[in-house]
Curated annotation (Swiss-Prot):
Top-rank taxon: Bacteria
Alphabetically ordered keywords of this record: ATP-binding, Kinase, Nucleotide-binding, Serine/threonine-protein kinase, Transferase
HAMAP family reported in the protein's UniProt record: Anti_sigma_B
Membership in a protein family: Belongs to the anti-sigma-factor family.
Enzyme category, top tier: transferase
InterPro entries per UniProt: Anti-sigma-factor_SerPK, HATPase_C_sf, RsbW
Catalytic activity: L-seryl-[protein] + ATP = O-phospho-L-seryl-[protein] + ADP + H(+); L-threonyl-[protein] + ATP = O-phospho-L-threonyl-[protein] + ADP + H(+)
An example Gene Ontology molecular-function term: protein serine kinase activity
Transmembrane stretches, start-end: none
Keyword Transferase carried by entry: yes
Protein source organism: Bacillus velezensis (strain DSM 23117 / BGSC 10A6 / LMG 26770 / FZB42)
Protein name, per record: Serine-protein kinase RsbW
EC assignment: 2.7.11.1
Length: 160
């Protein structure tokens, strides 16, 4: 089991225009860790979906809140946690309503609104959703590709 190396945390207003800042930060962290271009794109899509869901569904117009994003940089993986303190939902029921999640079905067969959860589960190695007080989405992407450097901190990944 790998031990945590670095944590990077940020909070953004629950507004669509701030999701791009999360994507830029994620891209920089994943690039320095040695993820491939395709893996970085997968990470950006999945994390954008989680952030966009929080922005669209967590808060109402009168009660705009924040979205918290935490990057856990491990030697063999990147963990991203997206959390809000807004309205919760029953994830298991939602997933069942949205289905299908089997390889025999195509993305065209997903219910409307189900693409975000489907993408997160398809593009990431692990996805866990907690919906007790607000919603927390924890996603993990393992480093499968070749890395430039096998150091133990993000500083070791930098070339400058």
């Amino acid at each position: 089991m790998s031990t945590s190396v670095d944590y990077i945390e940020m909070k953004i207003p629950a507004e669509p225009e701030y999701v791009g800042i999360v994507r830029l930060t994620l891209s920089g962290v994943a690039s320095r860790m040695g993820y491939t271009y395709d893996d970085i794109e997968d990470l950006k899509i999945a994390v954008s979906e989680a952030c966009t869901n929080a922005v669209q569904h967590a808060y109402n117009d009168e009660n705009k809140g924040e979205v918290s994003v935490r990057f856990g940089v491990f030697e063999d993986r990147l963990e991203v946690i997206v959390a809000d303190q807004g309205d919760s939902f029953d994830f298991d029921q939602k997933q069942q309503d949205l289905g299908p999640y089997t390889p025999s079905h195509t993305v065209d067969q997903l219910s409307e609104g189900g693409l975000g959860l489907y993408l997160m589960e398809t593009l990431m190695d692990e996805v866990k959703v907690q919906s007790n007080s607000g919603v927390t989405v924890a996603m993990t992407k393992y480093l499968n590709g070749e890395r430039v450097d096998h150091g133990t901190t993000i500083k070791n990944y930098e070339t400058n």
